[in-house]
Amino acid sequence: MRARYDDHPASRHRTSAKGCLAAHAGPDGRVSPDGRAPTDGSFLDRSFLDARVAGDRAAYLTDPNRLSYPNMRPSLLAFVAALPLIVGFALSGTHANPALPVVQFHDNAITSGRMVNGEHSLSLGIRRAMWHPYGEQRAGLEMFAFTAADGRPVMPAPMLRVKVGTKVHVSLTNPTDSTFVVHGLQSRRAVEDSIVLAPGESREVRFTADAQGTFYYYATFLGQGLRVGRFSDAILSGAYIVDGPGGAPKNEHVVVLSLIYDSRNPNGTASFSTELGVMNGRPWPYTPRLVYELGDSVRFRFINASNDIHPMHLHGAFYRVDSRGALMNDSVYSADQQRMSVTERLLPGETTSLVWSPERPGGWLLHCHFFLHTTPNIPYGAERKTPEERRRLRAEQHGKMDPNRHVLDEMGGLMMAVEIRPPAGWTMNAPTRRQLRLVLPDDSTSSDSSRLYTPSVGDGDRLTPPVTREGPGAPLILRQDEPTSIRIVNNSPEPTGIHWHGMELESYYDGVVGVGGTPGQITTAVMPHSTFEARMTPPRAGTFIYHTHLFETAQLSRGLFGALVVMPPGKDFDPTHDHIYIMGDTRTNGTSLNGLRALPPLQLTAGESHRLRFINITMVNAGLQMHLLGADSSTTQWMAVAKDGMDLPAHQRVMRAASQPVSIGETYDFEFTPVAPGRYLLQLRLPNGRVRAQQSFEVSARQ
């Protein structure tokens, strides 16, 4: 059944202490008058964790009272190890200051301000406050935050949400000793402007909400901007939503994405080893859980108020992209402009609105696919670790990874979970299936302690090895509408879990240990020297990805990823006219194309069409680009045919310049027909334009 992306009559938005947005409830369901959970530490008991390890998923995802986790060791496992160990210096005032108010969190559930004399009136102040991303019982950072009408500092900044045509009046005050520049509090059809707010200054701002869409406002120190790594001014961002005459839609979540840095490099720039990504002020696992029923339509507005790219990925389903915008403009798509996607790239300062109608129950992740932004949360402020302490922690934790604690110890940052409740009597069907194998090797030698996980693919008695032993793995070729079983054979000494990126399948098989599945059947790790059967029936032909979703730090960088191609009924994969290009990271070549920097030439014939499938599953290269140069060294043309495995509608299948950004977790399919003989060059380029890998197409004339 094809997903419906309209408002269902049964849709309902749960906002009670035991509902969709009950992220601030205490253990007994208590919610304080200001919407915060009790701060007596009572909701920090271990019952949820004990239940989680025992396999009771209801206590993890569906119980909103277990949202702050005890004993979350900051496990700087391996990615920070791969970063340069730069000795950063602490920001002034990063230790807890008991004299400062504490930043309160909210999820943009209500608009701030009220109507006064025909204007929507809103008071905003800026003040110093303590921000505790892991709860008030943990160390915090001294930050600047916008305040609500009652003077409380909040993150994100108070949401301004009005109907188009509303007159807005904002009172700004700055009682601090710093100068701030405020952006975004203005009409959208005017020339972009800003407000300089000096220490002790107050300003009155009036404008009309003259354009419908997803916008935002933000403040920075004088001389700073949104696209640089920010420190104590990094949480000064808020949503500004302008609805149509009908008002706000149901079941919508407005999410502000932020990155905060805790220390600087010697040259004064932000140290990425102290970067923390937050959704509405909190990182995973402190982000709210959303709970819906089958048939509900769920809407998201994402605002990238940070300095980096965020490819936002939904597990197990497609969402519809309804708009794309930025600070001063938003393109709300008409029906023929809308498209389906599983990963949407957001550049710094960009916004988007998405609609998802879930068709399968279970636990699903929605997260940034930039690996840096979902790694374990770093210790902040007084809990900060020195480089020496990091090395010691890595040595102590080597080989001690516990898959049952993966959701707590190995995941963090820009990630949230959505629970789709199964209807009464729901079961997974089990038709006769084609049998495939994904075989992970036991690859260790006395001279190499760093294992390679690059898998082979088995179909019957045949076992297809990867092209290179450093990744990617051999491609999996499936058939549309054919029930298929993929048996993961883990011959390695470490547990793993395989995610079928972009595939529409049951949550239990999605590959996220501790999140996937339904009560009574929880996704578990594929333990060493054991197997796991993943079942799927691909509803569409296209280009997808398989990759590890457990201990990604070690396994993704050592080859545990590959292409997953679904062919239409009656068609076989033809490698002479169908070409897979997967961008990944290897130990020898770093970011590469099919594991190589220089690929062997392809022999093509002028006038014959070829399908080029591009996949980005690198760890940190969210801004890679694919270019195809013609025989005259200028950019040639190709035709876009699919995005993330979903065929584009006919009116979007157009010839365009052969240049395409491909962010992490995205796939793109193009049809290329060389019109003239000669030497063409397919290039993988870094964001700065430097060529990272390439392959020549040697095109001969048709005989």
Residue ranges of predicted features:
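Asp/Glu-rich intrinsically disordered low-complexity tracts
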Residues: 6, 12, 18, 22, ...
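Short aromatic-acidic-glycine turn motif
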Residues: 133, 190-191, 196, 318-333, ...
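Bacterial N-terminal signal peptides
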Residues: 78-88
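Surface-exposed interaction/gating patches
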Residues: 258-320, 348-360, 582, 586-631, ...
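Extracellular/periplasmic metallocenter environments
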Residues: 175-182, 186-249, 338-425, 493-496, ...
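Bacterial N-terminal signal peptides that target proteins for export
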Residues: 69-80
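N-terminal, post-signal-peptide metal-ligating segments of extracellular/periplasmic oxidoreductases
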Residues: 93-204, 235, 242, 250-253, ...
